[in-house]
């Protein structure tokens, strides 16, 4: 047979699916010379397996629901009849080339034999479709043997030899290529173990494929088969069945995976490919996907995916966010964003449900509500009903880790704190999920530097009272950045701004531990999950609290010495001061002014120190964060710190600060040496374009003028 000449990247969506007559399934030599290795690329623990098991449902007609008879040009029962004698023995009710459970072969041999059988069956289906001039996918798919670590229920990892379905192409298999995951056990007793191993594959597929709506896995244990369907609400299983006694059902599953469009396999059909470029549509406006900027690695839950997209009509960049939300709360995030954008930089341009080709919304309940054949599915009541929404947001902003200098890192966090204060004071809302991904840097058209902003208000907490607090819940926070009190007692604690302040502190600590310089320079050979900060990532609230609350100043400083990259040695003072202010609350809780004072004074000290150590010349000194002069360098006109309207440089330390904090706020007697950042790359982003939201911002600025004056008066009274 001649190979197909059509080749596209595994992650792409092939063009030209309608006219594929004459395409011959490639005669690919199989098995390949080596087993494809798939290492783990995301952190997994036994909780993901227990959560998946807890959210598991049994749907009697799952295979028929996923691959309905009407979707096949040649039905599975016709295929089975055509396979008589050559591939399936109707007399003995047995697939002729299927590896028997009685064979005493090792796992790798069994995987090769099973993959060979599946490829032969797939090739037979393709040839029958071709000979009858029926439509076929644009790129052939093949089954390849893979080896990968798999997580078990007890938290241990085992090396597993299985099979992956992917589009035919290079042999460098990756998780992002996988269309279906197959786990194999030698006898029927191992079916539960095979299903258990499929969870690892599902988690990696969701974490590496931004266009995934659901994922399918196949468990083969001896002659027993079970189909597993994974989505953001959990897992759905088909009943177990014998591949020999139910040949049509087995053929339906294999044909659905290999001859139908990839939408049947869980890929989003609303994302289209034209000339190698991806497009999607929101509110009847088409956008081109320029890059994927975020994929939520947690398999269960909201499954947030964010893209940087460009609108052809105004040539502006936007962020488009895909998110699964509770059906009963589907409008809440959009309504909250409309409220928050009165004072925040984040703007909501469009918000709508993502619809299936039949006009119905994408939901996680559809597959769980099948009543075909009179058998009701077994679905636990606690499984959430999720719907898929798509939002268009602006401005597009860079991650905090793209800071160009340590001074800019502090400035961006200070900007985010100022915005946090506005939202809290004016709108009585707390962010509730401060982390290193939700603080962003955008090019401000007014200031001569990038400015920090907050994104993702999905976990926001509405507050009231004095001081204004709200009810915390299990959805608040991202584990490594969550305040100790919230980790230990999420349902009892009254969530206040000081909990978000603690998250700001952890953002700074984690960046100092995982980066080794500006411009998102990753720290080589360092695994934070194996470092002294491991309790942050293990959700160990007790150990985390011991370090933050109980360790002496000297012991905590030693903890930072063991954890921080040397590049950030001169930021340890900032972290220690913030820890004293936020964690050691004596007579009152810290305020926004208290926390911002720490940041502002350290920024001012660094600027003053740079002014003293920079040799004089005919040109203004260069600093990061100043206005671009057109040749890739940055210029500062005046080294004197500019007084902030929300934090007067001439003001003393706010009342209520600890003695240590007051001493920190005073001008330094012996400034620490300035860090040399001349050998690091300065991150530059294109100037921000004027977009549809520019006029909205001008209107909201007028509305918030009075609120800003009120806050300034409060600070004067406090000081």
Model-assigned labels for residue ranges:
Residues 506-516:
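Short conserved helix-turn element in protein kinase catalytic domains
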């Amino acid at each position: 047979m001649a190979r197909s000449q059509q080749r596209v990247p595994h992650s792409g969506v092939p063009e030209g699916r309608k006219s594929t007559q004459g395409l011959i399934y490639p005669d690919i030599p199989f098995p390949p010379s080596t087993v494809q290795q798939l290492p783990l690329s995301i952190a997994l623990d036994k909780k993901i397996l227990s959560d998946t098991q807890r959210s598991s449902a049994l749907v009697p007609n799952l295979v028929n629901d996923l691959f309905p008879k009407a979707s096949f040009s040649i039905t599975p029962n016709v295929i089975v009849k055509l396979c008589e004698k050559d591939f399936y023995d109707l007399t003995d009710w047995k697939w002729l080339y299927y590896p028997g459970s009685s064979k005493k072969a090792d796992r790798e041999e069994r995987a090769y034999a099973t993959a060979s059988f599946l490829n032969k069956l797939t090739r037979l289906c393709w040839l029958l479709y071709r000979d009858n001039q029926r439509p076929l996918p644009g790129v052939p798919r093949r089954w390849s043997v893979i080896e990968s670590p798999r997580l078990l229920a007890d938290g241990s990892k085992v090396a597993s030899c299985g099979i992956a379905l992917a589009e035919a192409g290079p042999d460098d298999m990756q998780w992002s290529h996988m269309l279906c995951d197959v786990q194999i056990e030698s006898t029927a007793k191992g079916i539960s173990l095979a299903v258990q191993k499929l969870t690892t594959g599902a988690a990696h597929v969701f974490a590496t494929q931004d266009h995934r709506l659901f994922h399918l896995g196949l468990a083969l244990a001896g002659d027993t088969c079970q189909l597993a369907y994974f989505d953001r609400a959990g897992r759905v299983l088909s009943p177990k069945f014998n591949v020999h006694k139910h040949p049509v059902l087995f053929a339906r599953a294999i044909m659905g995976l290999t001859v139908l469009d990839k939408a049947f396999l869980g890929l989003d059909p609303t994302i289209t490919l034209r000339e190698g470029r991806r497009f999607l549509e929101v509110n009847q406006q088409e956008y081109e996907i320029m890059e994927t900027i975020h994929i939520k690695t947690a398999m269960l839950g909201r499954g947030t995916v964010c893209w940087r997209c460009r609108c052809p009509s105004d040539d502006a960049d936007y962020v488009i966010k895909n998110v699964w939300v509770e059906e009963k709360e589907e409008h809440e995030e959009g309504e909250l964003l409309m409220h928050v954008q009165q004072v925040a930089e984040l703007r909501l341009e469009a918000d709508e449900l993502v619809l299936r080709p039949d006009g119905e919304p994408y939901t996680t309940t559809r597959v769980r509500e099948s009543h075909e054949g009179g058998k009701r599915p077994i679905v636990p009541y606690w499984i959430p009903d999720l719907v898929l929404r798509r939002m268009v947001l602006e401005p597009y902003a860079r991650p905090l880790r793209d800071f160009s200098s340590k001074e800019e890192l502090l400035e961006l966090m200070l900007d985010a704190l100022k915005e946090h204060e506005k939202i809290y004071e004016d709108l009585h809302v707390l962010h509730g999920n401060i982390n290193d991904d939700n603080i962003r840097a955008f090019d401000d058209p007014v200031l001569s530097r990038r400015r920090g902003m907050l994104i993702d208000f999905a976990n926001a907490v509405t507050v009231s009272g004095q001081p204004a607090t709200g009810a915390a819940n299990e959805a608040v926070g991202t584990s490594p950045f969550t305040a100790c009190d919230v980790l230990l007692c999420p349902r009892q604690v009254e969530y206040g701004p000081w909990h978000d302040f603690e998250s700001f502190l952890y953002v700074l600590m984690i960046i100092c531990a995982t980066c080794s310089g500006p411009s998102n320079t990753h720290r080589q050979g360092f695994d934070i999950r194996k470092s002294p900060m491991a309790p942050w990532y293990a959700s160990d609230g007790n150990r985390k609290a011991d370090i933050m609350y109980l360790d002496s100043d000297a012991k905590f400083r030693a903890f930072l010495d063991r954890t921080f990259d040397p590049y950030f040695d001169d930021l340890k003072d900032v972290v220690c001061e913030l820890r004293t202010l936020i964690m050691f609350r004596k007579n009152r809780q810290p305020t926004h002014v208290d926390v911002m004072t720490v940041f502002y004074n350290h920024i001012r000290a660094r600027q003053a120190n740079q002014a003293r150590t920079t040799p004089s010349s005919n040109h203004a000194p260069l600093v990061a964060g100043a206005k671009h002069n057109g040749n890739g360098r940055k210029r500062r006109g005046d080294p004197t710190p500019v007084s902030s309207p929300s934090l007067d440089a001439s003001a003393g330390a706010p009342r209520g600060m600890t003695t240590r904090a007051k001493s920190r706020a005073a001008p330094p007697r012996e400034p620490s040496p300035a860090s040399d950042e001349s050998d690091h790359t300065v991150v530059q982003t294109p100037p921000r374009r004027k977009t549809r939201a520019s006029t909205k911002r001008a209107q909201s600025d007028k509305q918030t003028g009075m609120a800003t004056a009120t806050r300034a008066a409060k600070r004067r009274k406090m000081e």
